[in-house]
């Protein structure tokens, strides 16, 4: 399913989910509208009832090219595509005559609390990019704590951006963590800098020069979990993010695609009616996205 003429004033986000964590799309580049965890409720908002809690927005990002921040006003050929067969969502656009950009995000099927965003930049001229991964807490959460660590293994050192917060009544501890995954290794990786804007938002960023014709790719992997699922969500969310980093982008996507190939073995085919076929595929896609074997959640 494709959308080539995106109107922010008439936009309803589509969800990419794995039965546990869901990502709702946004009409703005490098933004996701919401991140939702199944089974995560607390009393807030309208009425004295428990409502779904929005988790940390761990896939928001920004991109600057030659010092100019990318936004919906300075790009062209903006297109969004939902791949229902492999449950991913791709956004692509051009930035003047300087670069073509695309990114694809996944709620990884094999890792119920982990998401991935794979970003690709094709330089049309010599440019300098600054890319940031932004961790932002929804307004409903309280007592937000932000952390930044550099994790050292035998072969590399990599950044870990982490946040925790209490749910509105203090019933739950909510945690999220993410990291960059670079194709460069060791000392060749870009230098990552951490900045804290306020108690609800912090980010990590890097800067890199690209030559005309060069295609540069990197990824953001992150996890989110609460005390409703694990007794020690802070430790668990960092462990899951480190695991995703060590797996690498290719293995993460290959296992995700394989899991969705297995789900689509239960397909329904309608011949001679393309609209009905698309409707059926949409229903099956959302069914498979919102349920998960063994979770008792929907």
What are these regions (language model features)?
Residues 1-16, 20-298:
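Acidic/polar, glycine-enriched structural segments that form the non-catalytic walls/loops
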């Amino acid at each position: 399913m494709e959308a080539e003429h995106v109107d922010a004033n008439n936009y309803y986000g589509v969800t990419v989910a794995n039965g546990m964590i869901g990502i709702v799309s946004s009409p703005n580049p490098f933004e996701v509208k919401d991140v939702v965890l199944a089974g995560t409720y607390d009393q807030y908002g309208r009425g004295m009832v428990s409502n779904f809690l929005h988790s940390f927005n761990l896939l928001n990002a920004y991109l600057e090219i030659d010092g100019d921040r990318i936004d919906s006003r300075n790009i062209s050929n903006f297109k969004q595509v939902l791949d229902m067969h492999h449950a991913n969502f791709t956004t692509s656009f051009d930035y003047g005559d300087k670069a073509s950009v695309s990114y694809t995000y996944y709620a990884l099927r094999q890792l119920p609390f982990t998401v991935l965003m794979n970003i690709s930049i094709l330089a049309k001229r010599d440019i300098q990019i600054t890319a940031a991964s932004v961790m932002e807490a929804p307004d409903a959460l309280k007592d937000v704590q932000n952390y930044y660590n550099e994790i050292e293994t035998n072969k590399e050192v990599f950044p870990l951006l982490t946040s925790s917060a209490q749910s509105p009544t203090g019933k739950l501890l909510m945690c999220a963590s993410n990291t960059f995954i670079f194709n460069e290794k060791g000392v060749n990786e870009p230098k990552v800098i951490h900045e804290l804007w306020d108690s609800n938002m912090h980010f990590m960023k890097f800067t890199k020069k690209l030559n005309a014709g060069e295609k540069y790719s990197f990824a953001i992997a992150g996890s989110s979990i609460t005390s409703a699922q694990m007794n020690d969500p802070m430790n668990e969310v960092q462990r899951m993010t480190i695991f995703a980093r060590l797996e690498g982008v290719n293995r993460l996507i290959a296992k995700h695609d394989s899991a969705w190939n297995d789900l689509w073995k239960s397909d329904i085919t309608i011949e001679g009616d393309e609209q009905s076929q698309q409707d059926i595929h949409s229903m099956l896609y959302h069914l498979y996205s919102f349920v998960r074997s063994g979770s008792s959640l929907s």
